[in-house]
Amino acid sequence: MTNNLSGYRNKIVRVKTAKKRPISSSNWLRRQLNDPYVAKARLEGFRSRAAYKLLEIHDKFRLFTPNMKIVDLGAAPGGWSQVASKLIKASDNNLNNKIISIDLLKIEPIVGVEFLQKDFFEKDTEELIIHGLDGKADLVMSDMASNTIGHKATDHIRTLLLCEQAFEFALKVLKPSCHFIAKIFRGGAETALLNKVKREFRTVKHFKPVSSRSESTEIYLVALNKK
């Protein structure tokens, strides 16, 4: 995987603020139109720029191998599930090589991916995931984030709570010596969660992919080898 973006950087596109469009929406649209990773994802067939973040995480930590069972939390629009499907060489008829993806929003089919259009926090979701796995998972990955409101402390806490829920779920479904990755936003309140994770995994790292926007406080928690 390369982060060479030559050929994907376009002239700056300027967006006029429509009378009924909030300034924040115009800023988001401008950022999307001028983001080389958005252009690269479109040309290379990935559903989101987040695919490159997972590719970078894999390049650094070598998480994916054939014959894995993976849970993808907050999967829409499917960029991470796409990457995982390619890296484990998933197929629809190999039950030992599968991905269970969950999101409230629908995603289009991906080879080797069983999609549950569910709220992760509903009582029966966990049971459905475990049934779909038909055993324990080799990797739980979460790119879940709360809807941001522009208040960094609030956004930090909300996404941290999602990460904590994903971590508690991972402890239930992961095999020993297997892995957990999740998005968090830096903000100071993550220390308690990190200490919990360190008690349950042999190696815990922070990683900020190059493809993560420089102005974003997001980083990825990479927890390796569950005890």
From Swiss-Prot:
Query: Where does it primarily localize?
Result: cytoplasm
Which Enzyme Commission numbers does its entry carry? Answer: 2.1.1.166
- Pfam families, sorted: FtsJ (PF01728)
For this chain, the family text in UniProt reads: Belongs to the class I-like SAM-binding methyltransferase superfamily. RNA methyltransferase RlmE family.
Q: What is this protein called?
A: Ribosomal RNA large subunit methyltransferase E
Q: Does the keyword Cytoplasm apply?
A: yes
Listed GO MF terms: rRNA (uridine-2'-O-)-methyltransferase activity
Secretion signal, residue range per the UniProt entry: none
What is the role of this chain? Specifically methylates the uridine in position 2552 of 23S rRNA at the 2'-O position of the ribose in the fully assembled 50S ribosomal subunit.
| Isomerase recorded as keyword | no
The record's listing under HAMAP family reads: RNA_methyltr_E
Which GO cellular component term is one of those annotated?
Answer: cytoplasm
Q: Keywords in alphabetical order, please.
A: Cytoplasm, Methyltransferase, rRNA processing, S-adenosyl-L-methionine, Transferase
Q: Where is the active site?
A: 183
* Protein's gene: rlmE
Location of this chain's protein in the cell: Cytoplasm
- Please write the reaction equations for the catalytic activity of this protein: uridine(2552) in 23S rRNA + S-adenosyl-L-methionine = 2'-O-methyluridine(2552) in 23S rRNA + S-adenosyl-L-homocysteine + H(+)
Q: Which residues bind S-adenosyl-L-methionine?
A: 78, 80, 103, 119, 143
Q: Please state what class of enzyme this protein is.
A: transferase
